[in-house]
Amino acid sequence: DVYKRQAHPELEFVEKFKVVKKKEINRDKVTLISGGGSGHEPAHAGFVGKGMLDAAVCGDVFASPSQIQVYEAIKATASDKGTLLIIKNYSGDCMNFNNAGARAKEDDDINVDAVFVNDDVAVTDSLYTVGRRGVAGTMFVHKIAGAAAEQGKDLPEVKRIAQKVIDNVASIGFAISSCTPPAKGTPIFELADENMEFGVGIHGEPGVATEKFVTSDELAEKMVARVKDNAVIQLKAGDEIAVIVNGFGGTPLSEIYVLNTSVNK
């Protein structure tokens, strides 16, 4: 049987609605759902598992999943303790997840609540968002809210913990080349070999500044300063910090480790 040879036999793929979910749903804990456009793997299907998400809803490449996809995911993972939607702050995601949650409440009497992740401090607005963008910081919300749900905490408490994570996470991105969406077939923006784009978005949105290429150590200094010096979080001496260096899906692991070393300096 082909399903016995799967890499993750504990998961199932609902092909009709492009939902990756746990095969067995624990109805006695808060269930967590996230999702978004495809093309950002392992987000979000790679984060479905014990102590993290119960389901991930996969849209087309760089496109939000539809309201019906999210609604079907909510129904498939409905729990006696309720469901928390973890939504990245992009206009399409917010609209479709919100509408799906409202429908599940109205039509199916499912207890649904939501949080909105907006960790990117590069911009206060973009083509895709209302306010700051949700990017790599979403993983911390999956992990910490997932642990709270696994411990049996109720929906208001899981939401409170998730929001506390959101209030204490900030991120910044950069790129040395533009991505090329399959539907477009050409790079979203042009970037000379000697330049890098600071504050680029996960869909290839141009950043806040084009700067000359610098070493990993110099880049880390710029990024850490920008993350530390913002209106989102205020760091002080002695604070403990969890760091994630994210490759946006296109950076070799060796280069991520190089930058991670620079960040930790």
Label each region the model flagged.
Residues 2-3:
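Short, small-residue-biased leader/transition segments that mark boundaries at the very start
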Residues 40, 49-80, 228:
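Glycine-rich oxoanion-binding loops at beta->alpha junctions
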Residues 56-61, 105-132:
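Short, acidic/small-residue loops that bind anionic groups at enzyme active sites
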Residues 226, 232-265:
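C-terminal non-catalytic interaction/assembly regions of soluble proteins
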